[in-house]
Amino acid sequence: SNLDDIPSPYLEGVLDEFFDVEYLIPITETMRGCPFKCTFCATGSFNTSHKLHHQYHKEIRYLLEDLEFSNLVFRDPTFFLKASVVMDCAELINDIGNKKWKGQARGTFHRQYTPEQFKFMRKSGLTSVMFGVESGSQRMLDLMIKKVKREDYIKSAEVLRDLGVEMYASFMFAMPNENVDDLKESLDLMRQLKKINPNILLQNCIFLPLPATVENPA
């Protein structure tokens, strides 16, 4: 269904009484679903649906201007995949001024934007980019159908380091078919990313066979 047909809980004001501008960071989205079909993830089993330009503009302005939040998180599973939307949001946040924002990207982040676009995102307030790395083993990445190369994460880490933007990298262990060599490659990639940027945030997760995924189709 069209996301614009669903009333925004922000714009309807139903969440206002729960907001604490000093301690909370609001989450918004420009789309739902994911065009990729990673074997462990249920998000890819849903069709993608995008909000129209004017809808997410209203929400961003409401949160950052009307409620005066200083931070914003874009929770789209692959927010940075659509450069036109990302740059549109960056321009809006830059116009509002003195705000910070973050979002989730794929490993291919480093080759999806020009150097000028990267710099503008940083100027507009981009402070952190989150990656679901999952594994440092190319064999495992291929089995997961991640459609990304191990080296992509290294190059993205270098781009973020040069921009002065935080990198948040999540790894997943105990996947089906994972062996000791795969595990060692994941640990090695963690060390490489840490060497590139000592301030990187690393998260370790244990595989959970979610329903409606390739790993658990029930």
Q: Whereabouts are the PLM-identified features?
A:
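Flexible glycine/acidic-rich beta-alpha junction loops that bind and position SAM and/or redox cofactors
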Residues: 36, 83-84, 139, 143-144, ...
